[in-house]
Amino acid sequence: MTRLAPPDPVEERLADRLSARYGNGGPSTMVWVLRKLGKVDREVYRAVAELPTPWLDTPLRRVSGFANFSKPWFLVAAVLALFGGAKGRRAAVTGVAAIGVTSFVVNQPMKLAGERRRPQRTHLGVPEKRWVRMPSSASFPSGHSASAAAFGVAVGAALPQLKVPLRGAAAVVAFSRVYTGVHYPADVVAGASVGVVLGGLTAKVAARLAARRAVSS
């Protein structure tokens, strides 16, 4: 089967715009970097698609689907709120707030600005047994990866014993999005990076608010 690159990738569009605007005197290094990154991104995507791991198809497909609408993280937050005492409730609220902030930033300004098209799974060789529903939103950045990372960082800051398991779970979700073919690797890396930053900021704000309440009481 002949494999074709996805049509009109965003990094190629940006590179073409820079070349058209500045010509030979333009930022040639930036143009080269954009095209190189896009090429590497698609090569890694293909490499994941070609992994001989059929035993992972069903588990990772289910992980990817279950992570829709941040269901795992809301479930963890509910358990913490119900059984984690005062500290667990604070961690749950902080984690949910981090998801809210991150989801807004990723799904509004970032996806609208990026306009990256979703991968062409058929052309890029992703086995149909791995497929989940292809979202209609822009591909860059990954909202699933962003929310997972934000929740893990925010809750992990309040409850350090959960830091490793939550971040591990977030990594599995991020990988599942590439494995099932709905995101390029750069999408999940960017999403996770945004989630780490916003999750950390949310945790800091929550800690300061808690400290102020403690002083005032």
Positions of PLM-derived features:
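Membrane-embedded catalytic cores of phosphoryl/pyrophosphoryl-handling enzymes
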Residues: V126-S217
